[in-house]
Amino acid sequence: EMSASLVGSEMCIRDRDYGAGSYADYFKNVSAFILLMDKLKNDIAGKAFDNASLEELGEYNRALYKDVTGEAYNTSYANPRVSVRCFGEQCGRLFSMVYMEIRGLIVYMYERRLADATALIELFIELYCIVKDCAADNTEADYKHLKEAVYWYVSDYSDDHIEYRIRELIDPSLDFAVRIIMDSDLNDLRYLYRYGEYITDNEIKMAQHLNSLSEQQIKDMAATFTEGYRKGFILGNKPLEKKQTVNIRYCVGFERLVREEIKQFEAMGLKPTIYRAAVNSINKRMHIKIGYYGASPNKQMEFDHRFDNALYLDGDFVERKLGALKNAYEKHKELADVHGGPAVMEVFGEKPFEPDDAKECYHLDDKQQKLIVKYNNESGAIVNSYIKGEERSFTIIAYPSPEAGDKFTEIFDEIVKINTLDYDKYKVVQQRIIDVLDTAEYVRVKGCNGNETDMKVSIMKVNDGSKQTVFENCLADVNIPLGEVFTSPVLKGTEGVLNVSKVYLNDINFKNLKVHFKDGFVTDYMCDNYEDEKRCKDLFKENVLFNHNTLPIGEFAIGTNTTAYVSANRYDIVYLLPILIVEKMGPHFALGDTCYSRSEDVAVFNPDGKEIISRDNEVSLLRKSEPDKAYYNCHTDITIPYLSLIHISEPTRLAL
């Protein structure tokens, strides 16, 4: 019971010297946070927030995060730099990681996940007892026992944490966020505090702006999104009629729009599944947030803890985690079979994040990097066996946040316009580009104005031009807005250097990024984020290669959305835009899997009726002989702005 665990925490905080030697202040601070969580639990249960004002709720919310926001993080034990300075490298990293896990209690309290909370508090008490016993013997804290305690906590509860995460994805009965969206009075902005997410003026202003729009505007925006999802199934030749759930991902503040989207999806026979960005290390994907989320209390903190799993990641744990994943999907296979895939709403406008990669943080060693790659490969295959790639689809759209600046409302209106450009007009223009590209042996992309890009991209041969094409005419379905033609390049012969002065990839702002290729694979890379060359290479390997030693070019595309390009320059937001829009504003290259990953055998066609035959490359073809080598489970686009190009040329294939 959680109450029994809290008694243990109270004992810690009431012990005058904590019996913990140099660790006393750590246990005092973390115990105080745990007791604050008990108060939060009781306040929620007692409906203390029902009559609180917006200002009072804001004050309460800030109190939950006050020790990690702004300058407070510089003295917080959640900061590995602080903990390592106090307790040494091994114990410092461990105690910082544990405090980060304990901060997940905020979510457990709001979602009433008291069993998860109890297990976490019990770990804290176990660590306290280990340190106290060592202090009593006048010995240093026993790192071996401390690490074992954390390892077995994560391992023992991995089945529960993984199963719950999967259920959040596929089980509509887990409707914590859905109930907030559908049951709240969205004109009463106090609803924003019902999540437990960190709330700032940004989320409040976003909700206020959406509330100011007409009902028809909201319906039209929602229809762009939901129709994109529906068209993705139709154009991908996938069975929407078989599906019963859709996973909606959004940022807090967009509830009025999401409510209408839920209604429109339900008219298609789809119930929403909505889960929060993960708060425990076993379910996180580094610092990248997947799910719904509010404001970040501290982006540097999230980056610092991206590899907390390094504490416990070994071969046995990977096998345990894969087994838990397999068992959970098998247990809920009926729900998995009718899940349609994600519908994602991104936001942009915040200042690009430039992280400090501190040596005090956990990092994966070479062996652990290989284990992560192994887990991603095998888990991807497991997921695909239950939520089949040839039967699922997605859609993704982006909107500006108030952080975009004083012209936010103008920018918002402009993005809505860009998201709803004339489908038929672009279809014709893009088809003319495709007609030329289908005759090409390769495409050359060359930079100018200091951009060192010089890429040769090999193009698959079209055998029957009356029935076949190698470029997809991409309109407003899975990727909104419309505006690109793309292909899976032939890897052999694809070579050169790709250079961008600034690019925002996976929440990291890369400066002067250069990537070299030979036969379609990355051979070298560098950026100017740090003076130390190794730190620069590690940043790219961790956040773009995802710890692979290399990746192939899975996609080559030419963006055609000049409207987006003009608007971005007019409002000076080119470097604030998400890759979803930026990729429509110039040629781009995606590192990782092709756009047809795990659905290569499903025939797809352009609006002109021609079959797109470039669904495979030399890597994905290995699925027929060596399936464990066919996929990388990642896909990251890198775009070159028009003004950085001198030309894109397409030498015509000579007839044999």
Locate the predicted segments by residue.
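Short solvent-exposed loop/turn micro-motifs enriched in small/polar/acidic residues
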Residues: 438, 506-509, 549, 582
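Extended hydrophobic packing segments that form well-structured cores
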Residues: 606-649, 653
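Active-site bordering "gate/hinge" segments
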Residues: 9-10, 14-492
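Single conserved hydrophobic/aromatic residue that forms the stacking wall/gate
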Residues: 1-13, 646-656
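Short, glycine-/Ser/Thr-/acidic-enriched flexible segments
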Residues: 253, 350-352, 401, 450-452, ...
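Long, well-ordered mid-to-C-terminal structural blocks that present hydrophobic/aromatic surfaces
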Residues: 488-547
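Dual-mode signal for accessory low-complexity, basic/Gly-rich regions
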Residues: 525-591, 595-596, 600
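A short secondary-structure junction signal
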Residues: 356-359, 406-410, 458, 468-470, ...
